[in-house]
Amino acid sequence: MIYKIFYQETKERSPRREKTQALYLEIDAETELEGRIKARKLIEEKTAYNVEYIELLSDKHLEYEKETGVFALTEL
């Protein structure tokens, strides 16, 4: 499953929509909820990012992301 994680680079400042960034992670999980939990845990262990939202990408959404040229899997 591929998840899109919306985040702020630091937890020190309050979130601002204009500074929200996104990354893509491939997570091995049996359910969407399990994948979200694993993704959040991985981000918290490996980065100082402030996670705002974690979204499971459907096949159509993934194709759209690939077509726009912004899609790149992140390895942590």
From Swiss-Prot:
It catalyses: RNA(n) + a ribonucleoside 5'-triphosphate = RNA(n+1) + diphosphate. GO terms for molecular function: DNA binding; DNA-directed RNA polymerase activity. GO terms for cellular component: DNA-directed RNA polymerase complex. It comes from the Bacteria. GO terms for biological process: DNA-templated transcription. The keyword Coiled coil does not apply. InterPro entries: RpoY. Its EC number is 2.7.7.6. Keywords: DNA-directed RNA polymerase, Nucleotidyltransferase, Transcription, Transferase. It is an enzyme of class 2 (transferase). Belongs to the RNA polymerase subunit epsilon family. RNAP is composed of a core of 2 alpha, a beta and a beta' subunit. The core is associated with a delta subunit, and at least one of epsilon or omega. When a sigma factor is associated with the core the holoenzyme is formed, which can initiate transcription. A non-essential component of RNA polymerase (RNAP). NCBIfam families: PRK13667.1. This is DNA-directed RNA polymerase subunit epsilon. It comes from Streptococcus uberis (strain ATCC BAA-854 / 0140J).
